Amino acid sequence: MENVLGFVALAAGLIIGLGAIGACIGIGIMGSKYLEASARQPELMNALQTKMFLLAGLIDAAFLIGVGIAMMFAFANPFQL
């Protein structure tokens, strides 16, 4: 029983940690490409900014769904015997 709880805690930590790393890298790459595109074509800055913020929200939402799943594993453990 203790092994299962330990593995669940490890899995929850990995879900949150790796999800955060992936979201941060994704938003960072997207932000750099937005700045690059805005420097090349300044007249498209407003349209690109809207799309960038929409995609940043979707990336962040995927991370928060992972946090919710990890919290479900941690507090409402479906693997109890």
Swiss-Prot record:
What membrane topology does the annotation report for this chain? Multi-pass membrane protein
SUPFAM superfamilies assigned to the protein according to its UniProt record, in alphabetical order: F1F0 ATP synthase subunit C (SSF81333)
The cross-references to InterPro entries, in alphabetical order and at most eight, read: ATP_synth_csu_bac/chlpt, ATP_synth_F0_csu, ATP_synth_F0_csu_DDCD_BS, ATP_synth_F0_csu_sf, ATPase_proteolipid_c-like_dom, F/V-ATP_Csub_sf
Cellular component terms (Gene Ontology)? plasma membrane; proton-transporting ATP synthase complex; proton-transporting two-sector ATPase complex, proton-transporting domain
User: What PROSITE patterns does the annotation carry?
Assistant: ATPASE_C (PS00605)
Site positions per UniProt: Reversibly protonated during proton transport? D60
Database matches in NCBIfam families? ATP_synt_c (TIGR01260), PRK06876.1 (NF005363)
Q: What does this protein do?
A: F(1)F(0) ATP synthase produces ATP from ADP in the presence of a proton or sodium gradient. F-type ATPases consist of two structural domains, F(1) containing the extramembraneous catalytic core and F(0) containing the membrane proton channel, linked together by a central stalk and a peripheral stalk. During catalysis, ATP synthesis in the catalytic domain of F(1) is coupled via a rotary mechanism of the central stalk subunits to proton translocation.
Which HAMAP family does the protein's record reference?
ATP_synth_c_bact
Protein name stated in the entry: ATP synthase subunit c
Q: Provide the species name.
A: Azoarcus sp. (strain BH72)
